[in-house]
């Protein structure tokens, strides 16, 4: 490992040699038709009248025509009109804390560490794996991705360039996504958090990646230094755990001190963050001897550790939540990523993470030999705090602890069937699981709600996502029939097939750039801007009481399928509204892993019931489709 080199291959220009098309702008009429379909389903659950909604819709085409014309002009001049509006509304202007509310956790397979040296070694291997992947990105040696559909269209690779080169800087009213500039000296570094202290780990010097041995040596040095200074820390990591405006005010105060400004620049320019959590080892047992229920509990414990660090009293402040990638590695063997989501989607991060995991697993049991003399040393960052900044840190930590305590996480490892059986039933696995979640919500609450499932629009330049809404009229008719003892199996099967076809149609609309959410978001933003600048009336559709209910998501879902050679992985995140559920899922050939979440104190949710309903819905549909 001492002499290991990364191949410095020439850049592969085919990432950008073929210009991708701009996304289309859907027609007002098509978007309005789809919106009314979803509004009708939500209205049933709300027991609300659609009269005012239909009246507002009747006026909408006339009222929104100037907005549509303005949007068409923007689309002509902008690389991607959708991302221009979507990114600020989805992330940058949201004032809630990013932990739980926004930042997902990607849980890696647990590792058994016999010694502290094992912990440092595995962390160094994961770190080095990420650094090597960064090198592949820089030299464009990551193969350009293509869509999974029949056409195999080229996908935008911009997110790969951004994932380790962006930072979310808090601002009053709106955050800023900073693109880090490459330095002329060829030096790069990683931020390391250990015992709530901040350190720089040098990762590239004069253009050359430092050796694995130097990464491990620096981590060991950081652990030793942090132990000596552990009673002299002010918990700087608390800066990003609370409301975004408070985070911005904290840094406004801090940056009046020159030393703080220098340290902050080091932080913002770091490639990613490594969080070394030093705790007593926890014996979760061996995975192969666990029952399913024991394994689910172990998955849950790992999820809490990765998402929140179990709050400020444990490891929740040994984090830097404004960074895109936080690699969390605990001495208990728990490890994974905590992700600031505004920069990139899951598939990009999974591809990077799985490369690092394979690298670490390959070399972890190997005996490392290197020279005793090491010339690369980490750097400890210095901070000076005013009374005001200390008070803000304290308040941020209090908000964070409430969030961490409120997060309720469950894991369902459903191992009765998986992707293989679903394909044998001639159903899209993702569409199948989307309908399963509709049925589970109906079983739990007796109605459907607006549902979020991201659809990649990376076939367009600078494309991110739109929203596949699974709460269609066809889905409502099917789940209603499934709950009825009067409906025949044949009728239920007929309605299921209709719901599947509609799900496929809506999915195709979204990935082709004709979804409704990005379009409505842009129109709403333009209307709000006109009202603020000219006093022009906002279209009545945006003032309709049902609008806010249709545009919030009590069921937020995401497919995160991981590779077969890396088992025991899953992704999780908090619900996006207080009375809702988060429900990411991992579809494997013989099983499906669900990771539903909710907020403990909200009486409108029942996570245990919802988990049971997911399993029940899976069995119900298997029975429906089995001959």
UniProtKB/Swiss-Prot annotation:
Residues 1-20 are annotated as: Disordered. CoA binds at residues 418-430, 456, 559. The keyword Acyltransferase applies. It catalyses: choline + acetyl-CoA = acetylcholine + CoA. The gene is cha-1. GO terms for cellular component: cytoplasm; cytosol; excitatory synapse; neuron projection; neuronal cell body; organelle membrane; plasma membrane; synapse. The keyword Mitochondrion does not apply. Catalyzes the reversible synthesis of acetylcholine (ACh) from acetyl CoA and choline at cholinergic synapses. Required in SIA sublateral cholinergic motor neurons for a left-right turning behavior that occurs during the lethargus phase of the normal sleep process called 'flipping'. During 'flipping' animals rotate 180 degrees about their longitudinal axis. PROSITE patterns: ACYLTRANSF_C_1, ACYLTRANSF_C_2. It is an enzyme of class 2 (transferase). One of its GO terms (biological process) is neuromuscular synaptic transmission. It comes from Caenorhabditis elegans. It comes from the Eukaryota. InterPro entries: Carn_acyl_trans, CAT-like_dom_sf, Cho/carn_acyl_trans, Cho/carn_acyl_trans_2. Disruption phenotype: RNAi-mediated knockdown in SIA sublateral motor neurons results in abnormal sleep behavior whereby larvae display a defect in 'flipping,' which is a left-right turning behavior that occurs during sleep. Expressed in SIA, SIB and SMB sublateral motor neurons. GO terms for molecular function: choline O-acetyltransferase activity. The active site is at residue 341. This is Choline O-acetyltransferase. It holds the Pfam family Carn_acyltransf. Belongs to the carnitine/choline acetyltransferase family.
